[in-house]
Curated annotation (Swiss-Prot):
Keywords: FAD, Flavoprotein, Membrane, Mitochondrion, Mitochondrion outer membrane, NAD, Oxidoreductase, Transmembrane, Transmembrane helix. GO terms for biological process: ergosterol biosynthetic process. GO terms for cellular component: mitochondrial outer membrane. It comes from Aspergillus terreus (strain NIH 2624 / FGSC A1156). The gene is mcr1. Belongs to the flavoprotein pyridine nucleotide cytochrome reductase family. This is NADH-cytochrome b5 reductase 2.
Length: 319
């Protein structure tokens, strides 16, 4: 069990005001005194009002509002090559002060229509912070015969893509679970990172997080810098285990595929209360670990390694 981290909060300073009484000269009107006191009181009132107004941040406009909003067209402003088959794409908002409107955990639906063909739709989870104004970032791996990933990787800066959302996945609440486990493969890390970052960003949330992340090679590990930063900042609450199918000679992490033995070692036991296991990755990972989803709204039967280890359907969520 990880030790819980204690947070201390600074108490806001309270301002105190002294009251002064002044005796008016005899035989003269008290009106100037009342006027002075009244104006002083008004000044204090305005100061307090303006201070409170300044301290309360204005709610930012949301780009995606769901419902019948329809598609939102965004311009691609930056492209960053992460490795041989993965890029980070930054799409900017028309309103540079607006935020995406996504919550945790949720995704966006993307759409493009090839010339003479049918529209292609694919969901993606942004890796940028939900409170980040002005833009959103997608991390996308290109797959052979993957029409949306191939389209994204062929895009140039200033081209545009249609988005719709948010698509709610799992309604997270602070301290909803005592311990969560994230089992990911490849770009399946994106919703896991969204969730982990949100947990550690909230000082009220004391949830412990274990990540098991499988990839082919070391260069395929996405968001490694961000994950290491979380682990270094919250060593008592966040543990990451990396597994490589084709590791270098000096690799000290897991080798091969995410195995039953590894999960039995690093995950909390099924009998522990208030735990949740999240799974996201390619079809082969779902098949081996938890079984595939039937549809976005149907989690399907729990099978695979997690079933063999004794976890229940209610303890597992498939992104």
């Amino acid at each position: 069990m990880f030790a819980r981290q204690t947070f201390r909060y600074a108490q806001p300073l309270k301002q105190s005001f002294r009251k002064y009484s002044t005796e008016a000269p005899k035989g003269k009107s008290l009106a100037p005194v009342y006027l002075t006191v009244g104006l002083a009181g008004l000044g204090v009132g305005l100061y307090r009002y303006n201070s409170a107004t300044a301290e309360a941040p204005a709610e930012r406009a949301k780009v995606f509002t769901g419902g019948d909003q329809g598609w939102v067209d965004l311009k691609l402003s930056e492209i960053e090559v992460l490795n041989h088959n993965t890029k980070r794409f930054r799409f900017e908002f028309e309103d540079k002060e607006a935020v995406s409107g996504l919550n945790v955990a949720s995704a966006l639906l993307t759409k493009f229509k090839p010339e003479g063909g049918k529209a292609v739709l694919r969901p993606y989870t942004p890796v940028s912070d939900e409170s980040q104004p002005g833009f959103l970032d997608l991390v996308v791996k290109v797959y052979p015969n993957g029409p949306m990933s191939e389209h994204l990787h062929s895009m140039n800066v200033d081209q545009r893509l249609e988005f719709k959302g948010p698509l709610p996945k799992y309604p997270w609440e602070a301290n909803k679970h005592q311990h969560i486990c994230l089992i990911a493969g490849g770009t399946g890390i994106t919703p896991m990172y969204q969730l982990a970052r949100h947990i550690f960003k909230n000082p009220e949330d004391k949830t412990k997080v274990t990540l098991v992340y499988g990839n082919v090679s070391e260069q395929d590990i996405l968001l490694k810098k961000e994950l290491e930063e979380l682990e270094n900042t919250y060593p008592q609450r966040f543990k990451a285990f990396y597994v490589l199918d084709n590791p270098p000679k000096e690799w000290t992490g897991g080798k091969g595929y995410i195995s039953k033995e590894l999960l039995k070692t690093v995950l909390p036991e099924p009998k522990e209360e208030n735990i949740k296991i999240f799974v996201c990755g390619p079809p082969g990972l779902y098949k081996a670990i938890s079984g595939n989803k039937v549809s976005p709204k149907d989690q399907g039967e729990l099978t695979g390694i997690l079933k063999e280890l004794g976890y229940s359907q209610e303890q597992v969520f498939k992104f």
